Amino acid sequence: ISLGYAHFQFPGLKDFVKDATAHNRETFSHFVNRNYFSSLGEYTDGRVSGYEGKDKNPQGINIRYRYEITDDFGVITSFTWTRSLTNSQTFIDVQSADHTRKIKNPAASARTDIRANYWSLLAGPSWRVNQYMSLYAMAGIGVAKVTADLKIKDNINSSGGFSESNSTKKTSLAWAAGAQFNLNESVTLDVAYEGSGSGDWRTSGVTAGIGLKF
């Protein structure tokens, strides 16, 4: 059995983050216009600030189990789980048309938390090349999911907050190929390359871990 680190690339995540940020910023704009500027002259000088989220490569863990049927051949199974987290925030400061009224700024804020999760379950044959190295190939399913949570906080009207959550996912064929190197009689080094999906959902990466023989 081996336990290792997984580092994946999810190129389509950049577009998911961009689209989610744009959607939630538009939602925040509608919220602000409805709550602060629907009454003419109540608030003035709205100023918006904030930052956008950046896509990050998913990272996580890999667990692999190998069972030898004969001295040369066996079966191997693998479970991989990775996650990427990012967020964006937008703030608005307003001034009251009534200069005697004090406003707590930012008047409202919007936070978008974007989570990308990928997991896979694979199995396949293994082949012992010699006493130092074994090769294997696996196939199975890979699931990628992106979730965007929006939370708007209204600092002027305590009951005026708003939140929503949107998610999308894709299940695809996944595959992996790798090798195990015997460091000694009981410890192995395990490295593999894994891929899944296509287009915006294409996910690929490497896993590396240390295994123990029982």
What label would you give each PLM region?
Residues 13-21, 87-95, 147-158, 201-206:
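Outer-membrane beta-barrel translocator domains and adjoining extracellular loop/strand segments
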Residues 1-67:
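Short glycine/proline- and aromatic-enriched beta-strand/turn motifs that initiate or cap beta-hairpins
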Residues 129, 169, 195-207:
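Solvent-exposed loop/turn segments connecting transmembrane beta-strands
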Residues 5-11, 59, 79-85, 141-147, ...:
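Transmembrane beta-strands of outer-membrane beta-barrel pores
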Residues 7, 181-182, 188, 202-214:
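Outer-membrane beta-barrel "beta-signal"
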Residues 7, 67, 125-127, 181, ...:
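Residue-level signature of outer-membrane beta-barrel architecture
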Residues 59-63, 117-123, 173-177, 204-208:
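Hydrophobic, lipid-facing positions within transmembrane beta-strands of outer-membrane proteins
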Residues 72-75, 132-135, 181-191:
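Repeated loop/turn-to-beta-strand initiation elements of outer-membrane beta-barrel proteins
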